[in-house]
């Protein structure tokens, strides 16, 4: 057994070229949240319909956000990490 298997870590979804890590800071309602992104920007992110009522997003959740091309202060949430996955990302130094 390797060290990775002993710790229980597994492959995590990493951001694509147009995605950034973010932490949810505020729930705005109407399927919108405020997120603090790893690139230093604070954005209003939209929870897409495919995630509504299937994947519940709360404050302090770690998510992936795809900023809009035409309006950089807004974006779409594309992925939510479980608590254990977020802890693993913090241990690896990918997020704070």
UniProtKB/Swiss-Prot annotation:
The terms under GO molecular function for this entry are: RNA binding; translation initiation factor activity
What SMART domains is this protein classified in? eIF1a
Output the SUPFAM superfamilies linked to this UniProt entry.
Nucleic acid-binding proteins (SSF50249)
Alphabetized UniProt keyword annotations: Initiation factor, Protein biosynthesis
The segment(s) forming the S1-like domain are 8-82
Identify the domain of life: Archaea
The record's InterPro entries line, in alphabetical order, gives: NA-bd_OB-fold, RNA-binding_domain_S1_IF1, TIF_eIF-1A, TIF_eIF-1A_CS
Enumerate the transmembrane spans.
Answer: none
Q: What PROSITE patterns does the record tag this protein with?
A: IF1A (PS01262), S1_IF1_TYPE (PS50832)
**NCBIfam families tied to this protein:** eIF-1A, PRK04012.1-1, PRK04012.1-2, PRK04012.1-3, PRK04012.1-5
- State the family it belongs to: Belongs to the eIF-1A family.
Its biological function? Seems to be required for maximal rate of protein biosynthesis. Enhances ribosome dissociation into subunits and stabilizes the binding of the initiator Met-tRNA(I) to 40 S ribosomal subunits.
Question: What is the protein's given name?
Answer: Translation initiation factor 1A 1
Q: Recite the lineage of the species.
A: Archaea, Methanobacteriati, Methanobacteriota, Stenosarchaea group, Halobacteria
């Amino acid at each position: 057994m390797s060290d990775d298997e002993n710790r229980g870590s597994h492959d995590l979804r990493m951001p694509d070229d147009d995605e950034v890590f973010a932490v949810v800071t505020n729930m705005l309602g109407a399927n919108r949240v405020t997120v603090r992104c790893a690139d230093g920007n604070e954005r209003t992110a939209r929870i897409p319909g495919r995630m509504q009522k299937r994947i519940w997003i709360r404050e302090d959740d770690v998510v992936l956000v795809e900023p809009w091309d035409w309006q950089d202060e807004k974006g779409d949430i594309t992925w939510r990490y479980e608590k254990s996955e977020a802890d693993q990302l913090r241990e690896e130094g990918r997020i704070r």
